[in-house]
Amino acid sequence: MRPLMRNRASERGVDPAPSRWAWRMQRLLLTPAFLLFLRAGVPVLVLFGAATWWLSDTDRRAAIWETVAEARASFETRPEFMVQLMAVDGATDALAAEIRKEVPLDFPLSSFDLNLSDMRDRIVALDPVKSATVRIRPGGVLHIDVEPRIPVVIWRNPQGLTAVDVNGIHVGPIAQRMDRPDLPLIAGTGATEHVKEALNLYRAAGPLGTRLRGIVRVGERRWDIVLDRDQRIMLPKEGPVEALDRVIALDTAQDILSRDVNRVDLRLGARPTVKMSDYATNVWWEIRQVSRQ
């Protein structure tokens, strides 16, 4: 028997299989990644949207931040995190006082409120400090270990007297020369850039004893040795130590520096020059005039 009603779709020639888009959707629903997104991703997006809506209220956000701040403060102010005092080692009393002035702290305070790196940079920036380490020791002690600069010379400049280390870095001002009679005196523009050479000259001038008054940098090129009685030994730019040794040897043999001499000029090594004092020059001219008569 034939059915009374025929399938109209078959009469029209329509394919009973699903459409391309329907087939793709069915395949997508069977994909593990899409199933995971439906199971986990959609709930997460819903929760994120709800949280965003809830936090959009200013009062709620302020209450949360206040709670977090209180919890943090309660943790940071626990006794084991509190710093009670500062200890400075390796520095003189004056330098320790200067360090405490540079990094003023109101104890007790939490160790979380201390920026140790910034404190160290500020301490090392002080002229008398060569290096420093800053750390918090058990027991709530802020320990600062300082390596001070060692002054080796005193530099006389238009602003006064300044102690200088071997690298020419300023250590600190000096009120008067007699505060550090153990240090040699240098002067002149650019003298601090040649401290090591000045120290070599100072050691070579040892036989001059207490007659030595200082070493002056002239024209930022060479040195003058300044003695008492306004005498000067004018050294050349090259080989100043050797030139000074020759003058000292000449003085040992002939006592040249004990005579009425103002300048011993060694700037021209092949032609050293001696300048007599005005009194000695006048006497010499008188002797010549008498000898001509």
From Swiss-Prot:
Start and end residues of each POTRA domain: 81-149
Residues on Periplasmic side: 49-293
Membrane topology qualifier: Single-pass type II membrane protein
Xref: Gene3D superfamilies: Cell division protein FtsQ/DivIB
Keywords: Cell cycle, Cell division, Cell inner membrane, Cell membrane, Membrane, Transmembrane, Transmembrane helix
Transmembrane segments: 28-48
PANTHER family (UniProt xref): CELL DIVISION PROTEIN FTSQ
Function, as annotated: Essential cell division protein.
UniProt protein name: Cell division protein FtsQ
Organism: Roseobacter litoralis (strain ATCC 49566 / DSM 6996 / JCM 21268 / NBRC 15278 / OCh 149)
